[in-house]
From Swiss-Prot:
Native source species: Bacillus subtilis (strain 168)
SMART domains: HTH_XRE
DNA-binding region: 26-45
Pfam family for this entry, one: HTH_3
Gene3D superfamilies assigned to the protein according to its UniProt record, in alphabetical order: lambda repressor-like DNA-binding domains (1.10.260.40)
Record's keyword annotation contains Transferase: no
Keyword Transcription regulation carried by entry: yes
Alphabetical keyword list: DNA-binding, Transcription, Transcription regulation
Record-annotated HTH cro/C1-type domain positions: 15-72
Protein origin, superkingdom: Bacteria
InterPro entries recorded: Cro/C1-type_HTH, Lambda_DNA-bd_dom_sf
SUPFAM superfamilies: lambda repressor-like DNA-binding domains
UniProt protein name: Uncharacterized HTH-type transcriptional regulator YqaG
């Protein structure tokens, strides 16, 4: 992206700010990210150490700066759907996040109906532009979901890893999770 408002060069300062906001010393964050010394942490924060996605994610996780993990995904292009992170100020109030989620769900439902109609009308050989406004509206659910989850972590102590583990167990039981490698190979043989 040519006009990216985020710059990788700013990541060390963002890491320093997140550490300070979490009330951690350089010594404390060093221990939390894998037994690193204060000098190493200082080098990271001054842009003298090579930043990896793993280091940045671990750092921001220890600082409970979840939006910053989204920033890492975006800056390092770790996933095609990685987008600009949500402003942390929007993730402070769970009731506002629920209201936003309901609003986004309603709009996404309409957009999904429009998309379904577009797909039904689409015929072989007929070239028509994708309905990007509708697809974007559906994409907005990703941010709305993160806003709700992050706000529940901050205001009600939701444990994200526990939620992810529960979802994974249920998805495996319901057979909607990605099959293990052996299963995929067996199907393709």
């Amino acid at each position: 992206m040519e006009n990216n408002p985020y710059n990788m060069r700013n990541l060390p300062q963002i890491m320093r700010s997140a550490r300070k906001a979490a009330g951690l010393s350089q010594y404390q964050i060093g221990k939390l990210i894998g037994g690193k010394d204060q000098r190493y942490v200082s080098d990271v924060e001054n842009g003298l150490a090579k930043l990896t996605p793993e280091l940045c994610i671990k750092w921001f996780e220890k600082c409970a700066a979840y939006e910053h993990i989204d920033l890492v995904h975006y800056l390092f292009k770790l996933h095609p759907t990685a987008a600009a992170p949500i402003d942390p100020a929007l993730n402070e109030c769970a009731s506002n996040a629920v209201i936003n989620m309901v609003h986004q769900l309603e709009e996404a439902l309409q957009a999904t109906k429009h998309l379904a109609r577009w797909l039904t009308d689409n015929r072989p050989g007929k070239t028509e532009e994708l309905p990007m406004a509708d697809i974007k509206q559906i994409f907005d659910l990703i941010a709305a979901n993160k806003t709700l989850i992050y706000s529940l972590v901050r205001t009600h102590g939701l444990k994200m890893q526990e939620l992810a583990d529960r979802w994974t167990r249920k998805a495996l039981v319901d057979q909607v999770a990605m099959a293990k490698q052996e299963g995929r190979q067996a199907v393709s043989v």
